[in-house]
Amino acid sequence: MKLLFPKDFAADLPLKQAQFEAQSQILTAAKVFTAPMTVAAWTTKPSWGIVAGADKIINPDLERFYYQRAHSHITVLAGASHSVYESRPKEVAAVIEDAAKHAQQ
């Protein structure tokens, strides 16, 4: 996994940073996959989504499909990897700020 991580998960980050991230990953708690969900928030609340245009972990077309289905405000960041929050922090922050500003209106 550590050899694939920089290429697949963090392709638009500097190699040393991607390697550090590969070494510092922790396992996800299994209960996140089995916890019951009674209501999907996107059915009653506005949502925002970022399509990472060069994501190799989640296909960008699938990301776009999910966001369209949820009627999300969609931002596409061409060339961004799955680590978009680190490689494009200003653009991600702008989406978060837009959501914070408009979510309650």
Where are the regions a protein language model picked out?
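Post-His helix in hydrolase/transferase enzymes
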Residues: E86-H102
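Conserved loop-alpha-helix segment in the C-terminal half of the alpha/beta-hydrolase fold
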Residues: G53-A80, E86, D98
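Short secondary-structure boundary/capping segments
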Residues: T38-A41, R64-Y66
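Alpha-helical elements of Rossmann-like donor-binding domains used by nucleotide-donor carbohydrate transfer enzymes
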Residues: L4, F20, L62-F65, E91, ...
